[in-house]
């Protein structure tokens, strides 16, 4: 008589090994504080990106914000976005620059939408090498945050934001803020356009899609988010020039952007959000 396979000693032994292995893996991950499932997290007061000021010193909005269709939003993968055109001045000449922001959180399974893919898919052709260029900021407008352990988190600046509130900047802002820029040619109009971007992710800065996934999926963090910050302009002559102009606009807008993402120091210290599982244990004293 043929023994049913589910009752055979060999099968039961193999099943036992698999079950014990799975349990051992979970125990090991717990001991190492490895978190595989990331929870969504949002800015304090759930401020959306579209509430960023339309006019700041040296820059003003042109027209109305670009409201994406339902189909495009579905492709983008988030409803928390901003697509806006600003007009300013560079070297005594007017300059137009488009700012695009998009916020993602939780189990981030979307591939970041970046110009190298989206612009080419939209009919443009790449017209030169991709470069990573500096974004010069006026750091004198910022101050080192005295409440942050710089030995643990690196240099962390704070800025005076809206309503004179203090806003923390990304980790190591002075050394890591760079723009990944690619030139494109619109074959229909025969015009050249430069597009560049970086990411804010889990309190840090990344300049590539690969780097942002590493930051967002830190195995020892409970939460995950990233925000794409993208600049596009037809009025610049080089990648470096786009970086300089982006810096001029970010001098005014970066504190507002950071107010619309989680304060990662508060998250890491367990003080935010209110249901953070890592919140500090109240003292009995």
Residue positions per predicted region:
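Short, highly charged C-terminal tails/helix-capping segments
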Residues: 263-285
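Hydrophobic membrane-insertion alpha-helices, especially the h-region
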Residues: 10-27
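Short, Lys/Arg-rich N-terminal segment immediately upstream of the first membrane anchor
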Residues: 1-8
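Short extracytoplasmic
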Residues: 44-75
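Alpha-helical transmembrane signal-anchor/signal-peptide segments
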Residues: 30-48
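N-terminal secretory-pathway/extracellular module detecting exported/lumenal segments
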Residues: 17, 34-37, 57, 63
